[in-house]
Amino acid sequence: MAAGFANLSTSMPLNESEAIVLRTYPFRESDLLVTLFTRTEGKVRGVARAAKKSRRRFGGALEPLTYIKVAYEDRERQELARLDSCEVLESPLTTEVSYPRAVALGHVAELLDELLPDREANDAVFRLALSVLACLRGDEFRIPLTYFELWMARLMGYLPDLSACLNCGRTLNGSRAYFHALADGLMCPEHKRLASSEISAESRRLADQMLRLPLSRLEVPQKSAPDLSKFVLQTLERHIEKKLVTRTMLERLK
């Protein structure tokens, strides 16, 4: 599936980087508009010339969530880079992509695309994405996705304190705690807002474990902690000021 590195132009030096393909869109008659999360420059948008007309040049390298080595050229006074060549390092298509797995992969892509700024490298997020994608091989995706959501909130600086009530400062420990779509943190029973949702002590302990251990060493709980995921996604949506499309799709898989 890998496409060789055949440079089409030597007019400007090529940038080379590891990258994760986030999205592709039809562009003009035969091109694709591609959003990449590169290791060296962060999120880069570029054009893959004739990618729709012939698969020989890029092969399967532009499938979403494919881990690639990419060569691209930045052009003066133009926002879009020109993709020169791609080499597949790891593809999600090497194992069966069921509908639940496709939704899970799409969720990772959407979070990366919505949360990351253009042209700003973030190696911690890049390593996080690779580790989570390695765990999304089958249909058991809830815990890896919650891990990814939680760490994205933390790395973006959006994750509030989970140990104390945001209103009174009371330590929550194992007591009951609540969250609300418009509140930036957790609340104790005495200071919760109307229409708040509860997050269990077990889910808060899981969050603490997730923030201390790599995903590969995480003790997988029997329950998937949907309350923790809901809390984190509400936090992220509040900061990006929009609803995540894949969140609704994931909820329908229950």
Predicted features along the sequence, with ranges:
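Non-catalytic alpha-helical scaffolds and adjoining flexible linkers that form interface surfaces
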Residues: G4-K254
